């Protein structure tokens, strides 16, 4: 999904040099580099320079990845998670700084047709997410199809059935 999102962003919304893709897999990383995107094999201090993080991580890897990312999160960092079944409150807790959860979290659940730009994505935001953050998420997910905002974590997973 990270490949589909970065390709959509680069093709429609921003320059490849403005995107940092962290991908452990060499083949996917090479495809991103071929598009001109900045890439890294793992969490890097460069992450602290990015205000928007899109985490397209396998659910079983999410906690470990977030704990590695936690030192680089700032108050204004917008986290967009594309990991099935990982509650927004869990993400907020794993990114906590000094015991304070990081609540600028948007969950996104695109369905499979997003890979070809014809998908439907469910979006859900915690209360601390600002209106402009929602517009950013909408801009990202318009690149791979339609989107719909839902009210809670339970409703978001139903969107993948569309």
Ranges and model annotations:
Residues 4, 31, 64-65, 90, ...:
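Phosphate- and divalent-cation-binding pockets in alpha/beta enzyme and binding domains
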Residues 22, 45, 153-155:
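Residue-level "edge-of-site" marker
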Residues 26, 35, 42-123:
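Rossmann-like NAD(P)(H) cofactor-binding subdomain of soluble oxidoreductases
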Residues 90, 94-104, 120-158:
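Internal alpha-helical scaffold of NAD(P)-dependent oxidoreductase catalytic cores
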Residues 14-15, 74, 100, 142:
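Short conserved AdoMet
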Residues 1-42:
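NAD(P)+-binding Rossmann beta1-loop-alpha1 motif at the extreme N-terminus of oxidoreductases
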């Amino acid at each position: 999904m990270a490949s589909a999102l970065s390709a959509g962003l680069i093709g429609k919304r921003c320059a490849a040099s403005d995107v940092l893709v962290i991908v452990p897999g060499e083949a996917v990383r090479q495809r991103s580099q071929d598009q001109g995107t900045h890439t890294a094999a793992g969490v890097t201090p460069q992450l602290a320079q990015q205000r928007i993080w899109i985490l397209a991580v396998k659910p079983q890897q999410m906690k470990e990845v977030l704990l590695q990312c936690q030192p680089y999160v700032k108050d204004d960092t917008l986290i967009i998670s594309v990991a099935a079944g990982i509650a927004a409150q869990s993400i907020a807790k794993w990114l906590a700084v000094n015991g304070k959860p990081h609540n600028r979290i948007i969950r996104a659940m695109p369905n499979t047709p997003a890979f070809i730009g014809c998908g439907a994505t469910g979006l859900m935001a915690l209360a601390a997410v600002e209106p402009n953050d929602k517009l950013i998420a909408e801009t990202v997910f318009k690149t791979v199809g339609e989107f719909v905002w839902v009210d809670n974590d339970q409703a978001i997973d139903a969107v993948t059935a569309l």
